[in-house]
Amino acid sequence: MVNKKVNKKCLVTIPAYGRNELTHAVLPDVLAESDLVDLLIVDNGGHYEAVADEWVERPGRNLGWAGASNLGFRTAFHRGYEYALTLNNDTRLSPGFFAGLLDTRLPDDRGLVAPVYDDWWALQASTYKGAVSDYEPLDYYRRVPMLDGTALMISADAWEKVGGFDERTFGRFSWGSDIDLSMRVAAAGFGLYATERSFLHHAGMVSAGESVGKRRYFYRAHRDCERALRRLYGRATVRALRKALPERIPLEAPQPSVQVDHSTGASG
């Protein structure tokens, strides 16, 4: 690892392929917490137009979602960030989103951390139905066996142990590679957590759905996902994962700072 000094804790990577307006829409949500995170756009399509002096990498070919995410992970950890996060561009984030993911009250063994959201994985699904900008953070987190890659943060320690997404096994769209990464991170002894202090809205299947058609995209992505997971882990394990429930745990209250009376040296 190259230990170049950085001032932020996390590098956020957005894999982008067309639909610049989606990426532009989520930029303010990310940049609102620029005291905590830096932002990298991986331009898979070669046509991204920067609007906020954002850092853009143009690999010259379409790396796919998994490949672009892995490029972001490698870049982050070679530069010395503690965490790296991949974020879909068809998303919007609640206020304080990254503060929630980086909350030091989460267990020390965290290897993967993600938000709760309005998408379909029950392990991360929230009952909240309002505007993402009005979400009120809850002091709970969930211990889970797998996490969705829509917005997924990995620690440097976990990445050094297991690496990133498998770019070969899960087909063109990489569905299921997030489950596989979750399994490998958990097997290496790290915790997987979804925090209710962070909420994400996901439009879902936008860029890929438009490029190949939503029905065809869903069929191919789901087929490749199921085949790969069953081959790697077996039907029984995959079935158990689908039925798994989260363990909901309260976050400890922040500890009050100690006030020191400098005239006497006493604390109170």
Per-segment meaning from a language model:
Residues 193-213:
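Active-site donor/metal-binding and catalytic loop motifs
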Residues 152-154, 158-162, 169-198:
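A short, conserved alpha-helix in the catalytic core of glycosyltransferases
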Residues 81-92:
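Short beta-strand-to-loop acidic/aromatic patch adjacent to the donor-nucleotide binding site
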Residues 28-37:
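Short, acidic, metal-binding catalytic loop of nucleotide-sugar glycosyltransferases
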Residues 120, 135-154:
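A recurrent flexible, glycine/aromatic-enriched loop bordering the glycosyltransferase active site
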Residues 91-126:
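Conserved donor NDP-sugar-binding/catalytic core segment of glycosyltransferases
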Residues 20, 41-51:
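A conserved acidic beta->alpha catalytic loop
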Residues 59-76:
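Glycine-rich, basic loop-to-helix element that forms the pyrophosphate-binding segment
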